[in-house]
Amino acid sequence: MKSLKSRLWKQDAPGPTSPSSPTAVASTQSAEWNKYDDRLMKAAERGDVEKVSSILAKKGVHPGKLDVEGRSAFHVVASKGNLECLNAILTHGIDVATRDSAGRNALHLAAKYGHALCLQKLLQYNCPTEHVDLQGRTALHDAVMADCPSSIQLLCDHGASVNAKDIDGRTPLVLATQMCRPTICQLLIDRGADVNSRDKQNRTALMLGCEYGCRDAVEVLVKNGADLTLLDALGHDSSYYARIGDNLDILNLLKTASENTNKGRELWRKGPPLQQRNLSHTQDEGSVKSTQREQREPHSFQDLEIENEDLREKLRKIQQEQRILLDKVNGLQLQLNEEVMVADDLESEREKPKSLLAAKEKQHEESLRTIEALKNRFKYFESDHPGPGSYPSNRKEDMLHKQGQMYTTEPQCASPGIPPHMHSRSMLRPLELSLPSQTSYSENEILKKELETLRTYYDSAKQDRLKFQNELAHKVAECKALALECERVKEDSDEQIKQLEDALKDVQKRMYESEGKVKQMQTHFLALKEHLTNEAATGSHRIIEELREQLKDLKGKYEGASAEVGKLRSQIKQSEMLVGEFKRDEGRLVEENKRLQKECGTCEVELERRGRRVVELEGQLKELGAKLALSVPTEKFESMKSSLSNDINEKVKRLAEVGRDYESAQGEIRQLKRDLESVRAQHIRPEEHEQLRSRLEQKSGELGKKVSELTLKNQTLQKDVEKLHADNKLLNQQVHSLTVEMKTRYVPLRVSEEMKRSHDVNVEDLNKKLSEATQRYAEKKQEAERLLAENDKLTKNVSRLEAVFVAPEKHEKELMGLKSNIAELKKQLSELNKKCGEGQEKIRALMSENSSLKKTLSSQYVPAKTHEEVKASLNSTVEKTNRALLEAKKRFDDTSQEVSKLRDENEVLRRNLENVQNQMKADYVSLEEHSRRMSTVSQSLKEAQEANAAILADHRQGQEEIVSLHAEIKAQKKELDTIQECIKLKYAPLARLEECERKFKATEKGLKEQLSEQTHKCRQRDEEVKKGKQENERLRADLAALQKELQDRNALAEEAREAERALSGKADELSKQLKDLSQKYSDVKSEREKLVEEKAKQASEILAAQNLLQKQPVPLEQVEALKKSLNGTIEQLKEELRSKQRCLEREQQTVSQLQQLLENQKNSSVTLAEHLKLKEALEKEVGIMKASLREKEEESQKKTKEVSKLQTEVQTTKQALKNLETREVVDMSKYKATKNDLETQISNLNDKLASLNRKYDQACEEKVSAKDEKELLHLSIEQEIRDQKERCDKSLTTIMELQQRIQESAKQIEAKDNKITELLNDVERLKQALNGLSQLTYSSGSPTKRQSQLVDTLQQRVRDLQQQLADADRQHQEVIAIYRTHLLSAAQGHMDEDVQAALLQIIQMRQGLVC
């Protein structure tokens, strides 16, 4: 496979042909990647089967072709698990073993992502299972990592090697244990995985499981025979890794496993020597006992084991939660790293405008130079206008020559030998910044500053959050206060309205009454008038005066009534005014109420829901009340449980002590029996043996009765204990169910209130933060507007400087860079918009969660009545349990009294044993005497050895004396020789010589005699030494014989003991048989007596019948009837006898079975000391487990706090990133504004060009009026100017159309930019053409031919430039696509190994290019 580096090198490096040739690029692209390949890849990613099959039907399409990222459509389909697409590709035909850039084939990818069906399909097409990726892993490794047992089974069935190792030497079993997957470990072991396989550091799977705290996986490995004693390269074993992991469960498991292995080895080494000597019936009894021991386990151990298992499960859950939290923390850290990478990319892209500004400054300097040249030209035109004919032409020619020189120097400065695509590095490497040499120190300072700014943003965000929370709480409080005020105002207004309505009713009643009175007065007045008229006719003066007085009174009353009516009307008006004001107030209040109702409508809906929920919960609580009537609160229940468990443990201890005492008593009894029987068998008279046997039988019978009573009591106590355990289990289950229901359905009121407070505080803080953020946003907006205005000014100035005269190549380069920047910024804008949308969705989700939390907090509470009822029921159960405990204590006291009685009897038996021991002392030799005799023998041996040593010392001294004598003899011989020589020399006489010889002979004889005596003595000593050695050997043989005799006696004693045991067992059996036989004999005697009595009765009846027969004649029928009845009775009696015998046999069998059960119970019972030790060890382990649980809970709480802190930091960083993105959006808006300004400047420049053309026309007209000879030239110039005007107008129209299109659609921005650049190039070319035409007009007389030649050359240049631009664009876009794909994958977190390798290649290439 071709690497990414080689492809990039091919794209960047110039070929043998020209790099600007598009044919070469097209050929390489068609060979490497095709549009059909791209379509196939997209269809494979979408899972469109029809599209995939249609594309595959075309020629030249290969589904295994790799893209820039190093993957093919075949790999994509396998990784996504699309079975239909995979079938289509496989049926089309492909090499199944094709690999991607990471060395993985399709089988690897299907196993990695857990697609078992795709894996099965690939295996059907014979995809190899032994292929390895760049990390040395097979498909089985990936399946284990994906936790897919079905794919593992498929791979193992198709011959995948279970013990294959990767680069680090890890097998699939090692990876499974490292990732804590016990089921997969068991599956791999069942498939033949090596449990003790090692990696490159000599670490086994067990060591890694202990290090990572995978208790279940370690248990699986230990069960399947993992070696605990293996060491790694550093000399550490599995227990060391378990200590590093701080997992007590694993340490305990390893300890128990090592102890079991050690015990097994010891048993294997020692072997059972005594069991070989035992009889066959003893072996059978031992096997039966072992089976019964295995079947029966005490309840206390079961309870403790259950509790331990519960604690271990809790530990496992806590460990799993810790792992999940660690995974979350790692994920958050990865997100942080990705966001930091994105921020770095944004910073690098921000630095691009700086480089562009630097380039623009350079262009500004060049434009200043061109402006100066233009000024000189304008001066020349102004000075040349009024002069004569010959002189100005010469001056013009000089100026044109100067301008030609100036224009020729400018391209020479731009390195003519270098091709244009090599001038700007930013064209080929858009992500590299062409800034001047910036040091790493400045970059570090920038990063530090940005870090400080991020920290300030983080602090400000924290403060904003707190403020918003406070504001939220404040607003909630205000809403509540407003709601209360609204209700209060409603009530007041209702009361006032009622009062006003009552007052109106009273006023109306008064009005009606006053109107009635007025009507009465009117009628009365009319009546008076009539009466007065009548009396006036009569003319009585006195009556008239009285009537006048009455009239006055009536007028006064009428005026008072009218005044009252006016007052009432004024009161009514006032009340109406008040009612209007109240109505206005009511309207305002209604509006406020509506506003508050809109704000609190959701609250009311929530309250209704909560009310429904409360009703439902009340019903559930009522139902639970009945269930909880018998339950107990957790604290009291735990105290009760602890007290009950303590009492039960004490009782169990006492029972165990009683059992141990009972077992010890039985053991002592057995030993006494064995000793007594052995003594009797060897050295006791038969009479004494029978007496002792009778006594022992009596005692054994009494002890058997007591044992039976004790066993019955023990059974009753065990039943009581079992009942207590059952009650305890029921209570535990009830408490567990209640705790689960309380945890799942109810939340404490304190927690809900605290959550409400915290939410209120959060809302207030958020509101405050919102207000502050809005203020800051307004301030920043103002600053941004100010900066935009300044930027507009600067851009206008720059555009004015740039727009006068700019080189075409530089302008094209700038435009290409701007296009690339625009495209990148658009993509960034889309990404930022997506991120903003995601952030808004997250905010909505948080708001919904907040509302749901509020609902749940408000709806959950705990009533007090149920709690009191539960308390009462629990108190009653506690009293019941106390009573049961008192009864159990009484029973225990009875058992203790019986144990004391047994101890007294044991003391009596001990006394008998002492008597037997005294008899043994009298009959046998004691060990002390034997040791004394042995000591005397050893002393005699020591004395003999000492004497032997003395004899050897004397022998050595004699040998030394003999040696000294030999030396003296030799010296004397030498002297004799010398004397003889002297005699010979001096001629001594013969007599003397003879005498000397005699003397010498005498001395020789004496010496020889001495020698013989000494040799004789030596021989005697040697003989004595030999005799001592023989005596020593004989004594040693005697000692060995004595030791053998002692060993034989010990063996005989052991055999005698075993025989005594067997005899005692037989004696017990015989005694039982005797008892049974005696009982049977007594039963048979009683039955015989009954039968005798019945026989006598029958004989008397027969005699009576015979007498009757003799006295009276009886018919034969009666006699036969009597015979039949008698025969029937006889048969019935026989059947009854047989049934009784069967019952006897059954009872005997049951008795024998019960006796065997008793013996088995005695043998299988455990000592109390061992039980206490086990219990203490378990309690210690439970305490350690609880302590570790507390520590781990504290650690988990700390970790949760850390995770919450990390989440807050992540949120703050996200907010900071969002702020940065908003800033970048502002920068984009600035960029667009600058672009619009540039376009406006271009239009202004075109206007200026038009004005310049007009001025030029005027000058030409003046020249025509002055010079008639040059009319033809001026006409041609005018025609050319008109053509140029038309072209400028066309260009202006096209620019306007382009602007309209830009405003209409943002999709065609790139095409419009290209057109603008082409138009700008046309304008510049027209300028150059104008200059050339001016030179031609003044220099030659045939302008049309030269104009056509210039036009052709310009068109060729334009074509060349367009081709170069197209080639540069293609290369630029290809490189951008490569960079973007890898950077986007890195930013999105897809940092696979292939992406990392690609990024490393890019960095290396960058460094090479920079160098």
UniProtKB/Swiss-Prot annotation:
Regulates APAF1 expression and plays an important role in the regulation of stress-induced apoptosis. Promotes apoptosis by regulating three pathways, apoptosome up-regulation, LGALS3/galectin-3 down-regulation and NF-kappa-B inactivation. Regulates the redistribution of APAF1 into the nucleus after proapoptotic stress. Down-regulates the expression of LGALS3 by inhibiting NFKB1. Modulates isoactin dynamics to regulate the morphological alterations required for cell growth and motility. Interaction with ARF6 may modulate cell shape and motility after injury. May be involved in multiple neurite formation. GO terms for cellular component: apoptosome; cytoplasm; cytoskeleton; cytosol; membrane; nuclear envelope; nucleus; perinuclear region of cytoplasm. The modification Phosphoserine is found at S280. Residues 299-379, 442-624, 652-1380 form a coiled coil. Highly expressed in heart, liver, kidney and testis. Weakly expressed in lung and skeletal muscle. Not expressed in brain and spleen. Component of the apoptosome complex, composed of APAF1, pro-caspase-9 and UACA. In the complex, it probably interacts directly with APAF1. Interacts with LGALS3, ARF6 and ACTB. Interacts with RAB39A. One of its GO terms (molecular function) is transcription regulator inhibitor activity. Residues 13-30 have a biased composition (Low complexity). Keywords: Acetylation, ANK repeat, Coiled coil, Cytoplasm, Cytoskeleton, Nucleus, Phosphoprotein, Repeat. GO terms for biological process: intrinsic apoptotic signaling pathway in response to DNA damage; intrinsic apoptotic signaling pathway in response to oxidative stress; negative regulation of canonical NF-kappaB signal transduction; negative regulation of inflammatory response; negative regulation of non-canonical NF-kappaB signal transduction; positive regulation of apoptotic process; positive regulation of protein import into nucleus; protein import into nucleus. Pfam families: Ank (PF00023), Ank_2 (PF12796). Disruption phenotype: Mice show a high incidence of inflammatory lesions in preputial glands. Cells around the lesions showed resistance to apoptosis. It is found in: Nucleus; Cytoplasm; Cytoplasm, Cytoskeleton. ANK repeats lie at residues 69-98, 102-131, 135-164, 168-197, 201-230, 234-263. PANTHER family: ANKYCORBIN, UVEAL AUTOANTIGEN WITH COILED-COIL DOMAINS AND ANKYRIN REPEATS. The modification N-acetylmethionine is found at M1. Induction: Up-regulated during cardiomyogenic differentiation. By apoptotic stress in a dose-dependent manner. Its main location: nucleus. Residues 282-301 have a biased composition (Basic and acidic residues). This is Uveal autoantigen with coiled-coil domains and ankyrin repeats. Residues 1-30, 263-301, 1006-1031 are annotated as: Disordered. It comes from Mus musculus.
